[in-house]
C-alpha cells in the first residue's frame, strides 16, 4: 500500500513482451490504488470501527481476475461513483449492503451496485471502486500502488520478471499475486496456526485421558472375561492387542463425529485483523482431504496411546485372580 508507481510507468509495463491481450487487442492489466479506510461495523458496539481495504481498479478488473464473479447486482458504470463489495463484508458494515451508500472520505459518497465472490480469498473483504474515483478521493492523481496483469502463459513469467526487474528505469519487483498475498498473510496465518496447535495439544491430552479412563473402566467390568480368555490359552499379547484395537476404533468413531461437526465450520465466516495491512479480513475454514485424513490419524494415535496402559493392565491380569472377580 505504501508503494507509488507513476502512470507512465504502468504503460511501459503493460507494453512489455508476454502481456496477454483481450479480444480488442488491449493488454489485460491495469494499475491499482490501494487505501485503507475506517468504517462502522454493524452489530458491534456503537461507534466501533474496523479497517476496510479500498481498491481502485480498472474497468477490465473482472477480465484480469477471472476467478472473481458477481453474485448480486451489476458491474459499476465507468465514471460514476459506484462500487463493488466483497461478499465477506457486504451488509456487515454501515452503508455496504447492495443499494446503499457510504463515504470513502468526507463528501466522497459511493453507491454499492454489486457484490462479488473470489473463491474465499481476501478480495472478498475489499471494496472495489473505479481507479479515478479512488485517485480523486485519496489524492493519488497520476499514481498507482501496484500493477496487476495477466501473461500469455505461466511459462513466460521468468522472462517477464527478468525483463522488468533488470530495468533500472522501472525499479519494480515482479511477483505472482498468490505469492504476494501469501507473504502478506504470513503473520495472521502464523497466529492462527499457533493458536490452533495450542488448542489441539490440550484437546489431544484431554482426549487421551478420557480414552484411558474409559478403557480402565472397560477392563474392570470385563475382568472375568479376560480371565476366561487367558485360561483358554490366549496370550498376553493377544489380550493387549484386542484392547488397544478396541480403544483405537472407539477413538476413530469419536474422530468421525468430530470431523462431521468441523465440516459445519465451512459455513461460518470469521473476521480478524490482517497484521500486515491492518485491514479486517473475513474468511471461512476449508477442510481439505489431507487435513481430514490427518485428523483421523491423530485420533487413532490418541486411541492407541490412551488405551495402551489399560490394555497392559488387562494383559498382566492373572487368570485365577480374574476368574475369582
Name what the model sees in each region.
Residues 209, 216-218, 223-270, 294-306, ...:
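Transmembrane alpha-helical interface segments in multi-pass membrane proteins
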Residues 29-36, 48-60, 66-133, 140:
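Hydrophobic secondary-structure segments that place a key small or acidic residue at a functional site
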Residues 266-293:
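Short juxtamembrane loops and helix-capping segments at transmembrane helix boundaries
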Residues 137-152, 196-202, 233-251:
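Hydrophobic alpha-helical transmembrane segments
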Residues 193-194, 224, 237, 290, ...:
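Residues that define the loop-to-transmembrane-helix transition and helix capping
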Residues 1-53, 72-74, 79, 136, ...:
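Hydrophobic, regular-secondary-structure patches
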Residues 153-208, 218-220, 229, 237:
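Peri-transmembrane interface segments
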Residues 312-325:
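Short cytosolic juxtamembrane segments of multi-pass membrane proteins
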